[in-house]
Amino acid sequence: MHLLIVAAGSGSRMGADRNKLLLPLAGRPVLAWTIDAVMEADSITWVGIVGQPVDRAMIMELLAEAAKPVVWIEGGSTRQESVERGLQALPSVAQHVLIHDGARCLAEAALINRCAEAVVAGAAVIAATPVTDTIKRVDGQGIITGTPDRAELWAAQTPQGFAVEQLKQGHAEAQAKGWTVTDDASLYERLGWPVQVLEASPANIKVTTPFDLTVAEAVIALRAN
């Protein structure tokens, strides 16, 4: 299985002047924990890191002793563009691909393997967790306009897995139609293509804010004990 780590983010919501994936977490950069899980996943045989040129040297240091083939891919100005570039850089033999956010540093190898297995079996798939809070729709004036049925709501995570050629086709259509999507599952939705949900742990958070860093440190400490 081929896997792309999207690592082209910034640290703006962290209040940092550098990529949030290079901020320290339990004594190591955030991205190092993500890489560990990918390297531990038996299903993964090839890894592409999609990042910005300014971060390349530091990220490649983290990969100096990587146990699997890793390729550096220069990212774009948006996540969507970065994934497109990652897809173009895949080896010609790649039939399936997992897309994983570098900021989801608490993902475990078992989850990555489950996603890979589902994709090979023929499904487009995303890791997700059922929503436990009551969600409200709110208008531009801050007034509640509705309450979706919580039983139908899941919080999307990564990895997200797809057949390579179909995902490339989807991105080509999005580009032709001027669509902007925040993840690849949203692209499939717009095209009417089915995507299966695989239940993941609520611990598989995306580290975006200082509070997230605190939570991630606590989870890492708990796992160590």
UniProtKB/Swiss-Prot annotation:
Which InterPro entries would you find in this protein's record?
Answer: IspD, IspD/TarI, IspD/TarI_cytidylyltransf_bact, ISPD_synthase_CS, Nucleotide-diphossugar_trans
| Marked site: Positions MEP for the nucleophilic attack | 150, 206
Q: Write out the function statement from the record.
A: Catalyzes the formation of 4-diphosphocytidyl-2-C-methyl-D-erythritol from CTP and 2-C-methyl-D-erythritol 4-phosphate (MEP).
EC number of the protein: 2.7.7.60
Which pathway or pathways does this protein act in?
Answer: Isoprenoid biosynthesis; isopentenyl diphosphate biosynthesis via DXP pathway; isopentenyl diphosphate from 1-deoxy-D-xylulose 5-phosphate: step 2/6
**Known PROSITE patterns for this protein?**
ISPD (PS01295)
- Organism for this UniProt entry: Prochlorococcus marinus (strain MIT 9313)
**Is the keyword Transferase in the record?**
yes
Record gene name: ispD
Q: Which family does it belong to?
A: Belongs to the IspD/TarI cytidylyltransferase family. IspD subfamily.
Q: Which GO terms describe its molecular function?
A: 2-C-methyl-D-erythritol 4-phosphate cytidylyltransferase activity
UniProt keywords (A-Z) are: Isoprene biosynthesis, Nucleotidyltransferase, Transferase
Site residues, Transition state stabilizer = 13, 20
GO BP term (any one): isopentenyl diphosphate biosynthetic process, methylerythritol 4-phosphate pathway
UniProt name for this protein: 2-C-methyl-D-erythritol 4-phosphate cytidylyltransferase
Q: What is catalyzed by this enzyme?
A: 2-C-methyl-D-erythritol 4-phosphate + CTP + H(+) = 4-CDP-2-C-methyl-D-erythritol + diphosphate
